[in-house]
Amino acid sequence: MKSDSENAVIVADSDEEDIIIIPKNVNRARNVQPVLKKYFSEDNKTFEIGVDEAGRGPLFGRVYTAAVILPKDDKFDHSKVKDSKKFHSKKKIEEVATYIKENAVAWYVSFEDEKTVDEINILQATQKSMHTSILETRKQFNKKMKDHNKLEFTDYSYYLLIDGNYFNPITYLNKKNNKLETLPFTTIEGGDNKYTAIAAASILAKVERDNYIGELCEQNPDLAEKYGIDSNKGYGAKKHMDGIKEHGITIWHRRSFGICKNYV
């Protein structure tokens, strides 16, 4: 007699009534964390700026972006960094965000509010914030290099690693040749799950936006009670949608988004 249990085949001998348990070969899909690439280029004089956003999809509040330059040496622990969506502990992602800020060569986080989102649309608002984050990170890095006399201004270059499939190029004046040039870039779909610089940017942007949402809900308890903003972060969860239907929208809602259009 044979019968299958969840993890074994049970065989009973009809003569001696011995029961033998033979483990089955169980194929379980393992959620293996992909190893993120440290660099897009191995050139030590090309400093890569990872860029990502947080809060592009919600019906509510600001969109945040971050830009990060990670060091090209063995001092930075890339194993700590992963796509911000892969963190399930608030404490852990905040610890990693602090590590990034303390050990990155340069970084910057910026945002555009819901009014700007409604005025110029979410794509352009995100691009505007990305440009701010990139240029401030670049400015910060240039100052740091000059202050420490580490490199001449023309001895290094930048390369932008942008999460997503679209980027509005940044044009700047090259003081060496007095010509307008464009910062080179690559857009990478799912980049926050491929390169640590982009993943680091995704972490900083998410932590800043989550903190903004948390502070806003503390100052305005109705946001949590009526709309569940403290937990859904402004996305279209059921409690949020039901709250809009019952109470209308707040001054922080994006009036050009989805159901919000019906309550302007």
Question: Residue locations for each model-derived region?
Answer:
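RNase H-like, Mg2+-dependent phosphodiesterase core
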Residues: 1-264
